[in-house]
């Protein structure tokens, strides 16, 4: 479960390494985000010479605000067949306003639940889907 102030790893090659969740999207009462949910993040650690630009055309730097989708959580997720899956870290992928990933590669496994949430592009970039 991801909530405000949670630190996450970035699982793509967008040049951003660590982010902090500042808002969970999906209604005013939504407190926690799970796999497949969109969040607003603040960049905490980015490669300064990387060419990623935000929507206004400026280079991304620390404190920049981005949209992201959660791809891994340490809190287990219950599947419809009764099984559970959990990961070793909390990770997200940076997306644009249309929901497309900004990076061209995804590092590490991602959960199958992303397919149900209409993130097929992230699924296709991932090396392993669990």
Swiss-Prot record:
GO terms for cellular component: cytosolic large ribosomal subunit. SUPFAM superfamilies: Ribosomal protein L14. It comes from the Bacteria. Part of the 50S ribosomal subunit. Forms a cluster with proteins L3 and L19. In the 70S ribosome, L14 and L19 interact and together make contacts with the 16S rRNA in bridges B5 and B8. The keyword rRNA-binding applies. This is Large ribosomal subunit protein uL14. InterPro entries: Ribosomal_uL14 (IPR000218), Ribosomal_uL14_bac-type (IPR005745), Ribosomal_uL14_sf (IPR036853). GO terms for biological process: translation. The keyword Membrane does not apply. Binds to 23S rRNA. Forms part of two intersubunit bridges in the 70S ribosome. One of its GO terms (molecular function) is structural constituent of ribosome. Keywords: Ribonucleoprotein, Ribosomal protein, RNA-binding, rRNA-binding. Belongs to the universal ribosomal protein uL14 family. The gene is rplN. Transmembrane segments: none annotated. SMART domains: Ribosomal_L14 (SM01374).
């Amino acid at each position: 479960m991801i909530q405000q102030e949670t630190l996450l790893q970035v699982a793509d090659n967008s040049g951003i390494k660590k982010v902090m969740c500042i808002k969970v999207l999906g209604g005013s009462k939504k407190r926690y985000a799970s796999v497949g949910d969109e969040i607003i993040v603040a960049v905490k650690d980015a490669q300064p010479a990387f060419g990623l630009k935000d929507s206004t055309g400026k280079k991304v730097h620390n404190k920049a605000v981005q949209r992201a989708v959660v791809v891994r959580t340490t809190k287990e997720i219950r599947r419809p067949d009764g099984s559970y899956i959990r990961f070793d870290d909390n990770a997200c992928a940076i997306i644009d306003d249309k929901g497309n990933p900004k990076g061209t590669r995804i590092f590490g496994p991602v959960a199958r639940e992303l397919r149900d949430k209409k993130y097929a592009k992230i699924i296709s970039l991932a090396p392993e889907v669990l």
